[in-house]
Amino acid sequence: MKLLICKVCTLLSDSSLNLPRLVPMVNASPGLIWSFFSLAIAIAAAFVVAVHASAGHTTCSSARRGTLLAALATATWLAVTLALAASGRLSFTSRPPTAGVLIAVGVGLAIAVGTSRLGARLATGIPLAALIGVQAFRFPLELMLHRAYREGLMPVQMSYSGFNFDILTGLSAIVVALYIARRPNAVAVARIWNAAGIVLLANILTIAVLSTPTPIRVFHNEPANEWIAHAPWVWLPAVFVVAAIVGHIVIFRRLRYESRARERAPRAAAAPSAAAS
């Protein structure tokens, strides 16, 4: 993996490509860099596995093709976002702010995937407990963000020492997933958890945007939230935020499907009785 990244960086720094020279990586400890990188790859791999697992009763060739397409699309997204950050093309001070554009594209992509037929397939083909449990990635992620704050990469308000309480989503995801696995009918608990997770996610997204070096900046303490324009930190919005948004949308759709199924059940049971009378 290190060799692959080095080759990509070398390619991007080739003057014949007419790209900017590679920007220096924001100073961070090797442990933080590789734990961040590893978690992003794990989340990407989990998405591909989920696509394959949700194939259900489709033919083997169709399931294989869908999995390969998901893997190719995911790998392309990872490579493009990393390459853009490594090439220095992402910035919050340019007009338009290219880093902000990328974040907006990521959010739009997440909503598109979550509300698509693929999102519906994930909602119906993956157990609710698993859909909730995968959001536990936000616990180690928040530990990394706190470490990033301690190392001077990002402002305090984006960590749990400030106003970011999303670590509660990651911790509670484990508990709620285990509870749902034992009591599949406890959808009210899942509904409350999902709503709370969305609120906490919206909170940190708002704080992050208002901490960027743009005209709408509200938090003026240093450093500004511009580290996500660098590699590999660009994967914070491009991978982790996207995964969180897709996850919440898919869980919402799963809960809606189950609510509709419960509404239809009494009517289906009453139909034979009415016919017999």
Can you say where each PLM-predicted feature lies in the sequence?
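Hydrophobic alpha-helical membrane-insertion segments
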Residues: 192-207
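Hydrophobic cores of alpha-helical transmembrane segments in multi-pass inner/ER membrane proteins
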Residues: 37-47, 103-117, 168-177, 235-253
